[in-house]
Amino acid sequence: MHKDSNIIEELIFSFAQLPGLGNRSARRIVLYLMQDKEVRIKNLNNQLTSVLNNIMECDYCGNLDVVSICNICRHSERDSSIIAIVESVADLWALERSKVFKGWYHVLGKTLSAVSGNDAINSLKLPKLLNRIREYKVQEIILATNSTIDGQMTAFFVIDYLKDENLKISKLASGIPLGGELDYLDEGTLLAAFKARQSHDLL
């Protein structure tokens, strides 16, 4: 195989590693870029370089922004008495698109499983969450983890971690099917889940 072919195959392989893409979709993307490579590839390269150099994780919640405190955490009209705990930035963005939540967020970054060790637990940044709860006198925590086994396990771990705090802890309820992920739910389903959220005592 020619060297140029190897380069293209490596690019296809890289795209195929992205969530939601397989080899067929990756090939289509590469062929699309190659149809006008001087413009399309240069534009993509510039955009990726800009993201690499400018986008960072919010010091407070874990969202992505061009500054260390994201627009949501800076917004004076957000309800600082309530924090929704989500698994990923994708879930945070899904809730923002739905416009069903006007409080703050905490992005866990991952979930726990039955074999998770201390490194996985520490990566959830729960001490940072606890400091924020105490500093801003947060009154309610909404567990907006996905309805998967790992999501449920993570939710129960967070409940146990915060059990000594004077907090209302609730969890998204009806409308989210077992195994469902927030990023794939429509606005009506998310709204129903927020309105029908349950106290952790009922879980």
UniProtKB/Swiss-Prot annotation:
Keywords: DNA damage, DNA recombination, DNA repair, Metal-binding, Zinc, Zinc-finger. It comes from the Bacteria. Residues 81-177 form the Toprim domain. Transmembrane segments: none annotated. Coiled coil: none annotated. Gene3D superfamilies: 3.40.1360.10, RecR Domain 1. One of its GO terms (molecular function) is DNA binding. One of its GO terms (biological process) is DNA recombination. A zinc finger (C4-type) spans 58-73. Belongs to the RecR family. May play a role in DNA repair. It seems to be involved in an RecBC-independent recombinational process of DNA repair. It may act with RecF and RecO. This is Recombination protein RecR.
